[in-house]
Every structure is written in C-alpha cells, then in structure tokens.
Amino acid sequence: LGDVYKRQARSSADWCEVQTGSGMAGESLLRLKVAKNTRAEARSATITVSVWGYASPVSFVVKQGKGLIEQGDGKYRSVNEWVAEYMKSRYLWNRAIENVSLDYSLCYDFFFFSILDGVAAQDEVNREDGHWQGQKRMYYYSRLESDAPLSRTPGEAYVGSGIYLLDATRLGDDYIGIVVMVVIPGTPAAEAGLVRGDFITAVNGEEVTESNYQSLGRAVYDGAVDVTVNSVTWTDNGTTPVLTPKGNVQLGSATFTSPAIYMDKVVEIEESDKKAGYLLYMGFDVDYDEELIAAFDRFRAQNVTDLILDLRYNNGGDVLSSTVLGTLIAGEAYKGQLYAHMTFNEDRTEAGESGDYKIGVKETFESVYEPIERALQHALGLKKIYVLVSETTASASEMVINGLRGLDIEVNLIGMPTNGKNVGMEGVVRSFHNYDFLLFPVSFYIENAKGFRDYSDGFTPDVQIDDSAIYPGEFGTMMDQLGYLALQWIKTDNKPQLPSAMHTRGSCRSMRSFGDLWENRPVQPVGGAVMQPVREE
C-alpha cells in the first residue's frame, strides 16, 4: 500500500480534536485534544473511525459537562493572572488551586475570593486561613487590596476625633449612653481630656437612646461635636453606678496617626518592692520599633521587676517587630535561640525552603534587620510575663506568646481566648492600571522552638474572664479589671482566684451593651503576621 494509511478518524466537533487522525490498522493509540467548555450547557462530540477493508465505520461519543461562562468584563484580567500565579506558588494550600475553575474576567476582589472559596470547597483544607465561630468561617486571613483605603495599619493618617473605640451601654436601670473605651494619644479627644471610662449621655444636646446611638456614635468618632461627659463611680460594693457630670466638652476633629504604642508606664506594687512595666501595644509596625525600644529603656531606668503586656486590641502586624519585642523581653540569656520557625507549602518545603527568626539575631528569613540585634542592649531579660488578651489578640501577638513559651519563659494569660491565627503571610505589591495591588496570601505556619503550632483555636487564658460586661477603668491601674488581676498576681505570686460567676461575665461594675459601635470606628488595623511586602515590576 506504500504511503496509504489503513485507519482514519475524525471528530464531529471542533472543540474535540483528533490529533492522530490517520494511522496503520491494528492496535494503535488514538489521541484527542479537548478544549475547556465555556458554555452553560453540556456538549458531546462523535468520533468516527474508518478502517480500510471494513464496510462500516465504528464510532463513540465524547461527552463534556457544563462549562464556565465568563461573568465579568475582563478589565482586571492581567491582575487576576498575576494573582493566580502568585497563589499557585505561595499559598499554603497551593496544590488545591489546580482543582478550582477560575474565571479571569471577574473583578479582582471577586476573583481572589473565588480562589479561596474554591479551595475551601475541598473539605475545608484551608480551614486555618480564617477566623471561625463554631462551624462558620467569619472571614479569611488572606487579603488582596488596591489603593482604596479599606483598612489601615498603625502610623497611617485618619481624620476624626481620635477615639479608637466606643460602646453603647446601659448602666443599671437609670442611665444610657456611650462609654469611651480607648482614646488615641495626641488626638483631639485626648487633648480635650477624654479618658477610658468617660460616659457620654448627649451629643450636640441630643440625648443618647437605643434608637439613635449609631448616628451619635459616628458623630463622636468624626469629631467637631459637643459632648456631655460624665465620670462613673460605684457604690454598694460595685453594684450601683453614680454619675458625676464633667460638663460639656468641645470635641474637635483633625488628621492624626494611630501609633503602635498607646501607653507605657511603671506601676509600683503596693506593700511590695516590685515594680511592673505596663505596655498598651496596639500593633506590630516596624516604623515604631525605635519607640518600642525606648519604652523598654524607660522600664529599665525605673528598675521594673515585672511586665504587663496589654495585647487586648492588638491583632498583629510585622513579624520583624514581633521578634524585636521577643528579644526585648527575653534578653541576652536567650541570644541566638529560635523564636519562630516558618513552614511553607509542600512544594517549597520539598525544595528545602524554610524561615527562622532568632532572639537578638539581625539576619532573618526576609531581611537583615538591625533593631533585633540592638534590642538586646535594651532588654529586660525576664523569665515571666503577664499578657492581657482577648479574641482580637491575633497572629504576631500570638507569635509572642508561642515564641516565648518555646523558650520556657512563663507567659501568664489573663482575659479571653485569643484569635487562633497560627499562620502568616508574605506580601507582594505590583502596579496595574496606575493602581497598586497588595497581595497577602497565607503562606506559612508559625512554630516555636519546640515545634508547636497547634493553636488555631486560640490560647486559653490562665485566668479567664470576660471584661466586656465590666465597666472600664483607666489602663494600667487597679480600676481596669484585667490590669487589676495582673497586678494582684504580681503582688502575691499566686494566680488570682475568681468567683465562678466572673469567669464569663462581671458580677460588679456591670454594664449591658445594647449596640455595636465597633464597625463604625475609623481606625481599623489590618493585623496579621506579615513579612514586609516585596514590590514586583
């Protein structure tokens, strides 16, 4: 037959291409190339095979299920291609992305969440990417942001009164108002004399009620208002509130920054020769590491014997800053010892990649960072610390707890269980369409020197108490419930024993919150345990 082939095959549809259309009769391999279905309905193609010498051909049917219809306009296709490439390389559960159908035509935020949701649909393999309440994921830790100021970090500019947090509250049967929970130093609110525990009963002459607290709360956050302020004391063993008018206060509005350190002070323990350094630390930010070191210098100058680290409102930040703080606490005796070990996805681990951060060692996985080494000269060198925690305490904050415990430093926790973020993120920035896009996928587990990382359910406090129903007192004093317990622990060297009723809700100085003013606040830190983002060109 010479060059005459004895077998021919053809397809009835262009999407199903026969790549070995002709060949010799007998046993041979038939190769098909099938295109992805982009239509909403299933489809089929008939493959017909004719063999020389046989009167009738034979055929079979190739069926393909419903395809993916592009739902977007494709404006951000180049952004999405970059996001997908980085996620497939860096995401901690990157191998599961191969099983996700991706629509590159979507807006970048929908596309990003389609990846996360697609991985989650595979038996929640990325369960540790996010905060859960029961069986419900409340949010993902991984994030993608553009230039739009959706959330910010310590040091960024805001406009308003400078109140970090308010709470709409009822006191007993007689009083309703808005309680000041946290005031940012150096802001109009601080300059006007507002402090934690002030009780606002009217805004611009309008009394606070359960129907208007949202709008009045926003007005107080924004500033440029007149507020009626009261101080609160308690009688009858802390069961009866007494309001004392402080008068009307003109609350201004200005541009301000939210620093990482809201307060550092030294508290002398009564009937004791002990002194406690108190640090209200709101976010791990490398821009404030020099101030952090200076705060420890002030502690050293006053010969503090103990440290109360208040991380109730600290949801994390820079891994480098966490290592600086760990070094300032641990000191020279732990120099060179492992503070945190980063474990990456399977592909990177198989390639031998990992990352370490050590006490007092400036060489880190991500960069050479001098303040870590310099922190040794300013360290307290403690074997025991007291940490005030809440559900907001997360990531780089939990890294401090876990890292110090890995060194056998005693870390005593007071408050409520922490967030449980045992993972961190490597960031990357790239410009598209004259906008910057910042991508922070979860890309590593955080382990301590003992290899422990199993705290996705959070750290359980040694003294567990919900202070959200206890009227707030000034930070770093005996009037602050968690601060009081820490100071008592330091004074007696014994863990405080609480009445059973106080393990969940306060039994004295009781307040009843009736509305959420958390989401309305202008200062909303990003948090996380993050490595400094790398800019790609």
Predicted regions mapped to residue ranges:
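A short beta-strand micro-motif common to beta-rich folds, especially ectodomain repeats
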Residues: 41-52
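Short, small-residue-biased leader/transition segments that mark boundaries at the very start
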Residues: 1-5
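Surface-exposed loop/turn motifs at beta-strand-loop junctions within extracellular Ig-like
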Residues: 36, 51-53, 231-233
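Short, surface-exposed loop/turn segments at beta-strand-coil junctions that are enriched for proline
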Residues: 35-41
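Flexible, low-complexity junctional segments that flank or bridge functional domains
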Residues: 68-307, 321, 331, 505-537
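C-terminal edge beta-strand
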Residues: 54-67
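C-terminal "post-core" interaction segments
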Residues: 276-279, 283-294, 298-306, 315-537
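Low-complexity "stalk/linker" and mucin-like segments enriched in Ser/Thr/Pro/Ala/Gly
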Residues: 10-28
